[in-house]
């Protein structure tokens, strides 16, 4: 019997604090989240792993960060150091759709890193309740990246993330 080989994909979950990164991660890894600490600090490190098709996907849930410029907290420094110095394949940028204008500031900085990125519009239900409509195709075209609508509380749209990761990884789609 031939041993199955999996391709490894390492995904950084990035976004402002409290945008639902951990909720989405819990859906992605179906609760098999490993929580530890970043080396040398007491800040939690959340990591999850999933097999999807021929891929072994590792998700790293980075501490919330508002900007890649000045960092003040230990959490922000950890996120920034990871994004600029560590080896990972793509960014899953989670934003809070009702506060999209605020969150897109970080997105614009992440696009400048040059890594493949998928934009996840979370809390889409709240945006809809506020009368906010998002043209996903147009936003994707403007940012030159894949855009997915989700609801981290119900899991709606999260199943679209796996094929998007594989597509962006395989095609090496960069902004």
What is each PLM-predicted segment?
Residues 39, 43, 75, 87, ...:
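Helical mechanochemical/support elements of P-loop NTPase systems and associated helical scaffolds
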Residues 51, 78-147:
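Conserved C-terminal guanine-recognition region of P-loop GTPase G domains, centered on the G4
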């Amino acid at each position: 019997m031939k041993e199955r080989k999996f391709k490894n994909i390492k995904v950084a979950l990035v976004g402002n604090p409290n945008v639902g990164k951990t909720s989405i991660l819990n859906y992605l890894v179906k609760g098999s989240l490993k929580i530890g600490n970043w080396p040398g600090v007491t800040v939690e490190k959340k990591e999850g792993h999933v097999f999807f098709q021929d891929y072994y996907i590792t998700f790293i849930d980075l501490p919330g960060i508002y900007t890649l410029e000045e960092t003040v907290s230990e959490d922000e420094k950890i996120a920034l150091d990871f994004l600029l110095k560590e080896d990972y394949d793509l960014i899953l940028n989670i934003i809070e759709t009702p506060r999209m204008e605020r969150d897109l500031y970080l997105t614009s900085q992440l696009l400048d890193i040059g890594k493949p990125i998928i934009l996840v519009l979370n809390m889409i239900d709240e945006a809809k309740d506020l009368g906010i409509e998002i043209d996903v195709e147009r936003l994707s075209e403007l940012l030159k990246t894949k855009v997915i609508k989700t609801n981290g509380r119900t899991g709606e749209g999260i199943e679209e993330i796996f094929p998007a990761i594989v597509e962006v990884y395989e095609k090496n789609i960069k902004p």
